[in-house]
Amino acid sequence: MSWIDELSKIVEVFPPSDAYRFDETPPLVAPRAAENFVVVKPSNSEEVSAILKFANEKSIPVFMRGGGTGLSGGAVPTEEGIVLSTEKMTELEVDADNRVAICGAGVTLKQLDDAAFRHGLSFPPHPGAETATVGGMIATNAGGVRALKYGTMRNYVLSLEAVLADGRIINVGGKTIKNSSGYSLLHLLVGSEGTLAVITKATIRLFPQMRDMTVLAIPFPTMEDAMNCVVEVARKMLPMALEFMEKRAVEIGEKVSGERWVSREGEAHLLMVFESFDEAEEAAKIAQSLGAIDVYAATTKKDQDRLLKVRGMIYEGLRKEVIEVLDACVPPAKIAEYWRRSNELAEEYGIELITYGHAGDGNVHQHPLVYEGWEKSYFEFRKSLLSLAVSLGGVISGEHGIGAVKLSELEELFPEQFELMRQIKLLFDPKNILNPGKVVRKL
């Protein structure tokens, strides 16, 4: 009897398909998926426990699968084994009195948003695509455009139910914001990308519903001018979003969205979103005092949606042309220097680099476009680029995670950290069955 036959006695087993073979990682850098794997779709932690206990005894790799929206190859099954999909783990309950939602790992961002709204609450950060799942967002510590004001996924996870590699079910945290009760295993699991345990359920913090927005679009002559404005605005207030786009990114967003941006002038453009009109007014004055070409305020939903659409469609316009999506994060005051020096580096390698991102928190999205013979020089360029980010006080990924794509840079740039991570992995998963080859190399 094969191990697949044995597994089918525990849970229904499905054959491999492309729906579980890939995620959103650009194909040129995506890890190669295994041809042979099976898919299981457990409904609860008890079923997950039985699957993992079996897999651990047989030393069979298990690859976790949420919404498949990741950009670092974290959900790609790179070896023959089991793809564990959380799509049936959709339990969702809102405890409005305590302002929390208890979610199965397969609950999507849209389902969480809608449930919170029905109870007069909100989930503010919006850290991923609407089809991203709670489990996946926790596993990557997803961020998004509102991180400056509302933080990342880590700031909303109050408790977790998870299953260890040997099948043990653990519960960490509670329904409370405060927790000073020993080592924070909760925060060790957040951002672990499925390599330490399988997240099955989470208690998510909710907030009051957000107020009406005011959106500012502000072109600047230079990136330095724009970033001076970012630093000054963020020093005095916290916008819901504080985005930047270089001119080429704006042009791409316009083309794909079919919308017209407010100005064709300027090297850099800022997009600010406020919940307070008074703050928006003060930010506009700051921008004008720091050399803005003009300040455009959108107060109607139609005008706001038009501006947000230009920003939101940039990647769609680049998707088929990029080698990959880089998301280094640097201190906000260093964005202009990082942008200038990364462009100089790209020019040395003959690479066209399109840049935009979350200016308020320093998360820079860069898209190197495909060029002839890219395989010979691109990875050397990427290492130099990420080394530059680290030299400026930054990190190699702000929100997309390491997955299978940035392993070598993590190991080379943070060797002491990498070794500690290997030891932690060995403690949680000594047989290395959980998402092997992701975040840390095979043990």
Curated annotation (Swiss-Prot):
Topology in the membrane?
Multi-pass membrane protein
The protein's matches in Pfam families, at most eight in alphabetical order, are given as: FAD-oxidase_C (PF02913), FAD_binding_4 (PF01565)
In this UniProt entry, which residues form the Cytoplasmic topological domain(s)? 204-383
Induction context: Constitutively expressed.
Disulphide bond pairs: none
**Function summary:** Catalyzes the dehydrogenation of (R)-lactate (D-lactate) to pyruvate. Is likely involved in the utilization of D-lactate as a sole source for both carbon and electrons for dissimilatory sulfate reduction. Cannot use L-lactate as substrate, and NAD(+), horse cytochrome c, methylene blue or dimethylnaphthoquinone as acceptors. Active in vitro with artificial electron acceptors such as 2,6-dichlorophenolindophenol (DCPIP); the physiological acceptor is not known, but potential acceptors include cytochromes or quinones.
Spell out the PANTHER family in the cross-references.
GLYCOLATE OXIDASE SUBUNIT GLCD
- Supply the name of the protein: D-lactate dehydrogenase
Q: Which gene encodes it?
A: dld
